[in-house]
């Protein structure tokens, strides 16, 4: 199948009904999505990434909201990337951290770290109560969260890899990297909340970019950049980069002025 035929197929997948947006509670969300049982050929995955698709478990999806276009696919130009001063400081701060890219294997250590990370990011802190009690008070239980972990980070194509950060034998963070023919797509990253001052999310991106550069990979996809969003705005600091205009369906350079224009 030719590239243009694949593009046409992806662009004509039916749009899902409206559901609650994960980023803005007052807005509906819609997407195109398809499920893959097994591996997606790298060349086809390249086209899907280029069309703004991402993967979660065995589902590939593209945001197609009618009245909001703030979820901007963002990719760093790997071979041209230059770390900012603040990013270089993060690298120095983590000079004692060893990073490695390996095949993903779920362990009890990762399960425990995932639960602690989710609680620190999404639930009210109450250090006087055990984790299980805090999750229950927030309306979640550990079993359902661990099911999400397995689906989100360990239901993967065979080409998927895991980025790990270690210090003195301790696992500080781990994340899922999807590989296509000419790109890396960062799916999800988890870090130890006790080491928040290390800026491990930034460190993981820097490590992933180094790994991609060594392999002469062209693009490093950071997922959705949402201008001004407290959890999704940081991606604009990794440049040079391109953003995908969700209306025109084309990739453009990502200086701040053009990002602001798309956000309006």
Model region roles, listed by residue range:
Residues 1-106, 214, 218-264:
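Terminal substrate-recognition subdomain of acyl/acetyltransferases
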